Amino acid sequence: MLIPLKKMIFAGQGGSDIMIRKVNRKDIPECVRVIRYSHQTVADEFGFTKENAPRYVAFATDENRLIWHMDQERRLMFLDEENSVIRGYYSLLVKQNGECELSNLSVLPEYRHQGIGTRLFRHAISIAREHHCRMMRWSIVEENTLLRNWYERYGAVHTGTEKYDFFPFTCGYMEIRL
């Protein structure tokens, strides 16, 4: 069972501290970089560009968008850091209907395959439960079967797809009961 946590600290290699904590306003520029750079690998793999997918997260995320998420939508925003280096990010929009929306779960490519994404996803589930959410939903690039399979390993269910004119890919939708 996951325990509710506002901040998680893990013992890192060589005595370093690994922490998941809330995003502060001063973190936003670096969080933008983490999101854009993380999602650029998917853009490169599937041929998305600013021209054919200007609304894709790797191209559309900027400081104003994250400030809007923080101030207007009141999203819960968290980052993973080790020794003050931000390595990962996610946000959670808590809705009134007992659901929440996970967005922009990101891990910088050079830090992948170290359990950071798993820790961030589990943290998101824990925070969603703290806020009395019964369901967490999110979207993925449907063609990214590696990512879909990764989420399914943690109990997520694929719920459908949607093709939009403004994306050169199909949006896949996933959820997990909490």
Residue spans of the language-model regions?
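Acetyl-CoA-dependent GNAT
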Residues: 22-28, 33-109, 121-123, 127, ...
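C-terminal "cap" of GNAT-fold acetyltransferases
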Residues: 134-137, 141-148, 152-154, 161-178
